[in-house]
């Protein structure tokens, strides 16, 4: 049994699998565990006796301050050194200026895509930030980063005197008739339009590539963005393939 961890800025996903095909997963707020013992106190009730079966731990983290917690947790409770996801040559080539700057979550997504769906495609991951990644002939060619949906609404709320904090959901109208509708239209629908523009330009240059959609906020716009594949476990699958796959 393997423990797979995706440490994000807002939430962290913990998943267990035997074969990299079926996954059980749990989502925790990243800020709730500041020590290895706090992390154990949250995970032990969820994993139960399964913890005794863990023989490997793989981690994709974009929060460096949590890496020490994960390392100590792995050593103290499993006597295992975790394997960390990072860009390196293997099943994927990294055709960017500084591969070490590519976030571990994006590395995991690209590895999972190449392993499971093919060597050509576009990956949209909607989390705290929204990322777009391009894979051509098994080579990671780069991508784009946008603010995430919740980041946008919180930014408007915190950065202004009067704008409210609104529910993040799609707008089914062309123009907003009150402040809340204006924000929803600008944030949610505006993000979709931006993604469509980025994807459209990539397809003009690289061909009609399939699009895979993933990420904790992707369900909000799932019916608005044209995509061929929806895979909410893409990042976790990538952690498995990178750390324990062939």
From Swiss-Prot:
Keywords: ATP-binding, Coenzyme A biosynthesis, Cytoplasm, Kinase, Metal-binding, Nucleotide-binding, Potassium, Transferase
Catalysis: reaction(s): (R)-pantothenate + ATP = (R)-4'-phosphopantothenate + ADP + H(+)
Keyword Nucleus: no
UniProt family annotation: Belongs to the type III pantothenate kinase family.
HAMAP family noted in UniProt: Pantothen_kinase_3 (MF_01274)
Name assigned to this protein: Type III pantothenate kinase
EC number: 2.7.1.33
Chain residues that bind substrate: 103-106, 179
Annotated CDD domains: ASKHA_NBD_PanK-III
Binding site for K(+): 125
Note on how the cofactor is bound: A monovalent cation. Ammonium or potassium.
Cofactor(s) required for function per UniProt: NH4(+); K(+)
Residues of the signal peptide: none
Functional description taken from the UniProt entry: Catalyzes the phosphorylation of pantothenate (Pan), the first step in CoA biosynthesis.
GO cellular component: cytoplasm
Compartment annotation: Cytoplasm
Keyword Kinase: yes
Disulfide feature: none
Subunit annotation: Homodimer.
GO BP annotations listed: coenzyme A biosynthetic process
Catalytic residue positions: 105 (proton acceptor)
An MF annotation (GO) of this entry: metal ion binding
Known pathway: Cofactor biosynthesis; coenzyme A biosynthesis; CoA from (R)-pantothenate: step 1/5
Binding residue positions for ATP: 6-13, 128
InterPro entries: ATPase_NBD, Type_III_PanK
Gene giving rise to this polypeptide: coaX
């Amino acid at each position: 049994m393997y423990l797979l961890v995706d440490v994000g800025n807002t939430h962290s996903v913990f998943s267990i699998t035997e074969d990299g095909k079926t996954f059980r997963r749990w989502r925790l707020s990243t800020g709730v565990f500041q020590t290895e013992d706090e992390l154990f106190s949250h995970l032990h009730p969820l994993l139960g006796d399964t913890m005794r079966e863990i023989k490997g731990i793989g981690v994709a983290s974009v929060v460096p301050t949590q890496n020490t917690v994960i390392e100590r947790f792995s050593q103290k409770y499993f006597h295992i050194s975790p394997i960390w996801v990072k860009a390196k040559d293997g099943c994927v080539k990294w055709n960017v200026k500084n591969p070490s700057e590519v976030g571990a979550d994006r590395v995991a997504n690209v590895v999972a895509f190449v392993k499971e769906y093919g060597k050509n495609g576009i990956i949209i991951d909607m989390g705290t930030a929204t990322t777009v990644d391009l894979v051509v002939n098994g080579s990671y060619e780069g991508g784009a980063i946008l603010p995430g949906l919740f980041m946008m609404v919180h930014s408007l709320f915190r950065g202004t005197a009067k704008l409210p904090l609104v529910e993040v959901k799609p707008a089914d109208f062309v123009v907003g008739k009150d402040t809340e509708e204006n924000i929803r239209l600008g944030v949610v629908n505006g993000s979709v339009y931006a993604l469509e523009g980025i994807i459209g330009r990539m397809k003009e240059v690289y061909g009609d590539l399939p699009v895979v959609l993933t990420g904790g906020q992707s369900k909000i716009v799932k019916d608005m963005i044209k995509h061929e594949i929806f895979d909410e476990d893409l990042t976790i699958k990538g952690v498995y393939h990178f750390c324990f796959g062939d």
